[in-house]
Design a protein with these regions (language model features):
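Conserved phosphate- and dinucleotide-binding cores of soluble alpha/beta proteins
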Residues: 2-6, 14, 18-33, 39-40, ...
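Conserved alpha-helix/loop element of class I SAM-dependent methyltransferases that forms part
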Residues: 47-57
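Buried hydrophobic positions in well-ordered alpha/beta secondary-structure cores of metabolic enzymes
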Residues: 52, 64-67, 91, 138, ...
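Short, well-ordered alpha-helices that flank and scaffold nucleotide-derived cofactor binding pockets
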Residues: 54, 75-79
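Short active-site oxyanion
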Residues: 59-62, 83-91, 136
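Glycine-rich beta-strand-to-loop/alpha-helix junction loops that act as flexible
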Residues: 61-69, 73-74
Length: 283
C-alpha cells in the first residue's frame, strides 16, 4: 500500500471522545497527546479499533475479526450503521462469537463464497497476538485462527489493530503459537509437530486443555470441531518462517497454524503514551 491508501474518507473521522484522548498521525510517526491523558489498555484498543474503522467505505464487504480489540471495531461499525453513515456495508464473521456480536450491534452478515457471499472482501479488520518488524503476525490464541486466515486471506486489504505490547522482535516471543489439528490421532499429530523442532532448546508443545466446572481437563474445541496444539519457544521462532510454515502444513492432521505471514497490509498501533502509529506493508 502507498501512503494514499492510509488516508480515510472525510466522513469516517474518529469519534469526538477519541479525538480528545489521542491525536493520530500517519506514516509511522506518533503525535503527542496532552500530558494529563492516562489511557488504559482497553482505551488503547478502542482508539486503534476506531482508527481502523475509518478505512471502511459505504458498500464494502468486510472481514469481521475476533477478540477483545476487534470487538471495539464491531461496536463502532454498529454505531455508524445505525447512524446511516455506512450504507451497504456487511461483514463475514471469523467466529461464532463474532457472528453473535455483529448480529447484536446490527451488522448485516454474509457467508464466505457461495451464492449469498460477496464477490470479494474489500477489507478485514482484526487484532493480533504478536506483530514482528515485517508485519508478520501470530493470531489465534483464542482459537479462531482457521476462519480468520480463510477470511482475511481472501480480502484485498487486512488492517490489524493492536496496542504496543503486541510488538515483538520475533514471532513466538510472548506466548503460544497455535496449530489447529483434527481430533483423530491428535497425540500422534502432536508428536509430528514436535519433530519439526526436535533439538531446539526451550521448545515444547502441548494440546490446549480446558476445565468445565469440576470436571476433568478436556481438549479445547474450536468452532470447526478441531483441537489446538500450543507451541512455545524460549526466545521466539528463529529461521525462515515460510519454510517452518510449509513443514507444519505438510503434516497430515494439521489443519492450519497461527502464523499469518505477509498478510497484513496495515498495522495500527496504539502506544501506551496515547499516540497512534500506522505501519504499512512494504511493496
Amino acid at each position: 500500500m502507498g501512503s494514499a491508501a492510509t488516508s480515510p474518507p472525510p466522513s469516517m473521522k474518529l469519534a469526538q471522545e477519541d479525538l480528545k484522548r489521542v491525536a493520530a498521525h500517519m506514516g509511522g510517526a506518533a503525535a503527542s497527546p496532552p500530558p494529563s491523558v492516562k489511557l488504559t489498555q482497553e482505551d488503547l484498543k478502542r482508539v486503534a479499533a476506531h482508527r481502523a474503522v475509518e478505512f471502511v467505505e459505504p458498500g464494502m464487504a468486510l472481514g469481521l475479526g475476533t477478540g477483545s480489540t476487534a470487538a471495539h471495531a464491531l461496536d463502532r461499525l454498529g454505531d455508524l450503521l445505525r447512524a446511516g453513515a455506512l450504507p451497504g456495508v456487511a461483514g463475514v464473521p471469523t467466529s461464532l462469537k463474532t457472528e453473535l456480536h455483529a448480529t447484536r450491534v446490527g451488522i448485516p452478515l454474509l457467508p464466505l463464497g457461495g451464492d449469498g457471499g460477496p464477490s470479494r472482501i474489500h477489507l478485514s479488520i482484526d487484532g493480533a497476538d504478536e506483530v514482528d518488524p515485517d508485519l508478520n503476525l501470530v493470531k489465534g490464541r483464542g482459537g479462531s485462527l482457521l476462519r480468520e486466515k480463510m477470511i482475511e486471506g481472501a480480502g484485498e486489504k487486512f488492517v490489524v489493530i493492536v496496542d504496543e505490547s503486541k510488538l515483538v522482535p520475533r514471532l513466538g516471543c510472548t506466548g503460544a503459537v497455535p496449530v489447529e489439528v483434527i481430533p483423530f490421532g491428535a497425540p500422534h499429530t502432536l508428536g509430528l509437530i514436535r519433530k519439526v523442532f526436535d533439538g531446539l532448546p526451550g521448545f515444547h508443545a502441548r494440546l490446549r486443555m480446558v476445565r468445565k466446572d469440576a470436571e476433568e481437563d478436556t481438549p479445547f474445541v474450536t468452532d470447526n470441531g478441531n483441537y489446538i496444539v500450543e507451541m512455545f519457544f524460549e526466545d521466539g521462532i528463529r529461521g525462515d518462517l515460510h519454510n517452518i510454515s510449509d513443514q507444519l502444513l505438510r503434516i497430515t492432521g494439521v489443519v492450519e497454524h497461527g502464523m499469518f505471514l505477509s498478510m497484513a497490509t496495515t498495522v495500527i498501533v496504539a502506544n501506551k503514551d496515547g499516540t497512534i502509529t500506522v505501519m504499512d506493508k512494504k511493496n
